[in-house]
Amino acid sequence: MKDVLYRLFEHQYLGRDEARTILQNIAAGKYNDSQIASLITVYLMRNISVEELTGFREALLEMRVPVDLSEFKPIDIVGTGGDGKNTFNISTASCFVVAGAGYNVVKHGNYGATSVSGASNVMEQHGVKFTTDIDRLRRSMEACHIAYLHAPLFNPALKAVAPIRKSLGVRSFFNMLGPLVNPVMPAYQLLGVYNLPSVSYTHLRAHETLMNLV
């Protein structure tokens, strides 16, 4: 990791495969907290490249706990967070509205890293019990038109970095990654981002979805 950090500090970029390996190593506990915090800090000082984001995303998808809810044809309504405005959780509130209208929603989220109102914070306050049990998720979808996937239960890397992200308290590239790695891989997604330049990265999700449907 030391060599990788030196290269990044010199404004070099990671290749797709290298980025994938780094996320796999984070999940395996091969880096200490300071090294992971340094990696996060790099991407606060420059934009992440599409190749880097793609590699990170591929690693998370490869390590995820897969969930098949395709029979419900659900939509994912999600935001990156990190806009610094300390608003209420808009995407989660939107999920309640859409599910209440009878449309199936599969929400993938986490505790807030830069706020107190992450999706998991909101769901927990409403009495939702986080689970990976597919039967419970299906029953939730059938009864309420919504199923909630707490990200750390479905991906070891996201669990590994959660305390570091919370300690830093600043927006990171994981804000971009979270919405791109819903374990259900829903064909439909409404995605909110923290600033206009981030919109370009949503094309990654759109492209991958189209490729999966071909």
Segments predicted by a language model, with ranges:
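Acidic, glycine/proline-rich low-complexity segments that act as flexible tails and inter-domain linkers
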Residues: 1-87, 101
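Conserved small/polar residues in nucleotide/adenosyl-binding loops
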Residues: 202-209
